[in-house]
């Protein structure tokens, strides 16, 4: 955290109740300013754990122990969220949910290069992380157990934003609603050709409001997905605002073949 002024308050996305802690779990927070460590567990609390920094400066917060969740109850703001500049490690806390963990953290610049393999919920994890230079290195993240990516990157609209998700295993994800919604930055050009979608995954508004890609982008994506024998079935997906290449009102032959294969699996593509 980069604290600009004396007596600045910040809050962590942690509450002292059973939504964050299972029985027997607790964490110890080192605030990085020489103050006493704070122990947090399920004590029935209903507010976010906060701290006041008496002096301006850069502080590293360390959290040890165990908890099942780091995140917020919906898309709510917490004190000092824009002052968070980097997350160096997710540790070994046993976290399963990062729901809205970094919501509206406009100053966030970097995240760990590995994700805990216990994580299943990434709902809104980086929603409105819209700093101009924000482009997290998530290329090696193991997301194979994740089921919820709803709004994961929504409104990540910074000019540099274009995370490498090319090797992500999203085969267990059931919710991709607004996943890339409003990712309107100049660099945005996601490579998803290796993805295997789960049968029936909800992709409503997956790209709504995002930067329009060249028609070749959708051509290549459809051909790659159709060639994947493990690709799921019964999927309704709206690629809007993106379109595939058309010549005299018809898709290219390879794209037409891909559409036929996917539609044969029960896909509805718009």
Feature-to-residue mapping (PLM):
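Negatively charged
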Residues: 1-270
């Amino acid at each position: 955290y980069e604290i600009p002024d004396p007596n600045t308050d910040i809050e962590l996305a942690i509450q002292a109740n059973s939504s964050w802690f299972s029985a027997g779990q607790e964490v110890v927070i080192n605030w990085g300013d020489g103050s006493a460590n704070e122990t947090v567990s399920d004590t029935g609390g209903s507010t976010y754990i906060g701290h006041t920094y008496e002096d301006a400066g850069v502080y590293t917060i360390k959290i040890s122990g165990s908890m099942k969740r780091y995140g917020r109850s919906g898309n709510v703001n917490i004190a000092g969220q824009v002052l968070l500049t980097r997350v160096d490690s997710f540790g070994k806390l046993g976290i399963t949910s990062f729901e809205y963990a970094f919501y509206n953290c406009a100053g966030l610049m970097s995240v760990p290069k590995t994700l805990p393999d216990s994580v299943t919920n990434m709902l809104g994890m980086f929603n409105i992380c819209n700093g101009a230079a924000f482009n997290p290195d998530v290329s090696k993240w193991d997301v194979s157990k994740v089921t919820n990516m709803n709004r994961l990157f929504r409104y990540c609209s910074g000019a540099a934003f274009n995370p490498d998700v090319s090797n992500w295993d999203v085969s267990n994800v059931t919710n991709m609603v607004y996943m890339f919604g409003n990712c309107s930055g100049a660099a945005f050009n996601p490579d998803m050709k290796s993805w295997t979608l789960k049968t029936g995954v909800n992709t409503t508004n997956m790209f709504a409001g995002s930067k329009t890609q060249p028609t070749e982008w959708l051509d290549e994506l459809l051909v790659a997905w159709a060639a994947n024998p493990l690709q799921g079935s019964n999927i309704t997906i709206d690629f809007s605002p993106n379109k595939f290449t058309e010549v005299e009102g018809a898709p290219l032959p390879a794209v037409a073949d891909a559409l036929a294969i996917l539609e044969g699996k029960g896909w509805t593509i718009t």
